[in-house]
Swiss-Prot record:
MF (Gene Ontology): calcium ion binding
Residue windows of the FG-GAP repeats: 47-89, 106-148, 284-334, 396-438
Disulfide bonds: C564-C578, C571-C587, C593-C606
Species of origin: Mus musculus
Name used for this protein in its record: Cartilage acidic protein 1
Compartment annotation: Secreted, Extracellular space, Extracellular matrix
Occurrences of domain EGF-like (ranges): 560-606
Keyword list, A-Z: Disulfide bond, EGF-like domain, Extracellular matrix, Repeat, Secreted, Signal
Keyword Transmembrane: no
GO biological process: axonal fasciculation; olfactory bulb development; regulation of synapse assembly
GO cellular component: extracellular region; glutamatergic synapse; growth cone; postsynaptic density
Keyword Glycoprotein assigned: no
This protein's encoding gene: Crtac1
Pfam families assigned to the protein according to its UniProt record, in alphabetical order: EGF_CA (PF07645), FG-GAP_3 (PF13517), UnbV_ASPIC (PF07593)
PANTHER family, per the entry: CARTILAGE ACIDIC PROTEIN 1
Amino acid sequence: MAPSADPGMVRMALLLLPPLWLLPLTGGSQRAEPMFTAVTNSVLPPDYDSNPTQLNYGVAVTDVDHDGDFEIVVAGYTGPNLVLKYNRAQNRLVNIAVDERSSPYYALRDRQGNAIGVTACDIDGDGREEIYFLNTNNAFSGVATYTDKLFKFRNNRWEDILSDDVNVARGVASLFAGRSVACVDRTGSGRYSIYIANYAYGDVGPDALIEMDPEASDLSRGILALRDVAAEAGVSKYTAGRGVSVGPILSSSASDIFCDNENGPNFLFHNQGNGTFVDTAASAGVDDPHQHGRGVALADFNRDGKVDIVYGNWNGPHRLYLQMSAHGKVRFRDIASPKFSTPSPVRTVIAADFDNDQELEVFFNNIAYRSSSANRLFRVIRREHGDPLIEELNPGDALEPEGRGTGGVVTDFDGDGMLDLILSHGESMAQPLSVFRGNQGFSNNWLRVVPRTRFGAFARGAKVVLYTKKSGAHLRIIDGGSGYLCEMEPVAHFGLGRDEASSVEVTWPDGKMVSRSVASEEMNSVLEILYPQDEDKLQNTAPLECGQGFSQQDNGHCMDTNECIQFPFVCPRDKPVCVNTYGSYRCRTNKRCNRGYEPNEDGTACVAQVAFLGGYSSAAFRLSEPLSQASYLSLGLGLCLQLYAL
């Protein structure tokens, strides 16, 4: 006969268990409706010219032929690089970088290079994006046997400027093995630098930051001199670099840089406003030193106006870090659900609204490493005054359990307002590219915003906020590099469901801002926003509809309304404490808590302050890291006392 349990111990255990309604919702079972349908056979059928079966890696989206439409640039590892253009007459993607020396795109093929990372941006201010390929010939780390390529459209064709005499003499062409590359306008000039995440071997191969040297360049004569400014910018570090993403993460407008690394801590380079950076990853709680990062993306998942970070760890727990503020300092908190964080051999991570329902999805592109490993898809659903609900979705045809996923991008290449998904494969098996279209949300509203730099190029790193009539403010960053080895389209894509946009605001890396109304007839279209000229300041006082929770300020821009200072007072007597939030407010009771505890979001209970858990800072407490027995004991005892007090 089994011994009976002690009733007192059972009651104690029940007290220590949180109520079921306080447990985070994780979505339960996977949603049955498939999100994606494969259209590869009709849009990009495998063939020798446009979709060869080869090892491919990074993918980027830019306007290669300068005709106003996007092309998809693919980094070929065992074959040529590809430039895929959508042919509307044929309803197909066609490679325009053909194997003909007379073609202006011939050099982009670079058949000799083992390309892995790719990015595009305007480095010289001519209004046209250059294209950078990171090659890793014959090297996993340290020194490679073939240089990277930086292509510029010059003399009516694409040419590698790293091989120009001036740059050969300067020794700026990287011979180091690396992974991701990304574009950053570090000073707000409209001219971009290229951040190179090298894979160091000991003290060989630090990260690099390549940009134009204006004093040594003569653009009228076609001379574009380059320099590596990583050391002076404060980003020259030795690490096993993996993923890179760029945007105003900590800054209000200036571009910061997040790098998730392997065999070492991540970097969060905070732009100091003068083009130099300070690594704040540890203090912000995103250093994750014991994991091995891969794909990364930036987004505002809970629509609080702050930039959050999502990334995958190689066969480790994936992270979804919400940006918080504690005592005036930035902290990130991992809210990944158990299913979301489940380890996998992840490569690319993409955050986008694939069904235009207002909520962002996160796509994990895995590689079939040693065994099958299907791709995964999650919806991150905003909840008022609470952490987002994370719901697992059915990727449909994009499941690809045997896919050797290495890269991927989103773009709307056919102009229907729905994001298309392009995945690359390789490394352990040659596979063609895959193309997918969404199955859901065809009747939902959408808006696509394309900001331009002062020179007319895509304003990568710019922040776009769309104010709506019913659902508050939505934030996007114009991508300068993300995913893993990749760069998404330079568009702020907003899915709006049944809602409509009221106004849009663009903030450039130099702090310049433009706000304008969005008319009803402009819904379901593409808006281009030009860089503001000095005379545009006179137009900023035009009336704007900012939507619920926001109001137009004297400077002409929409800002959060502080309802807590309004008269009459907005909170009832039983919840007299008003807390202003982004686009809203909440009311809670005036609850007092013992030392080491603080009121929860609605003030109904006291919860332990993270700073008191075993000496861990409140930056980012992780249950995956061991606590001492004394810490667990003090935490459990404290919870008992607080529950008893209630």
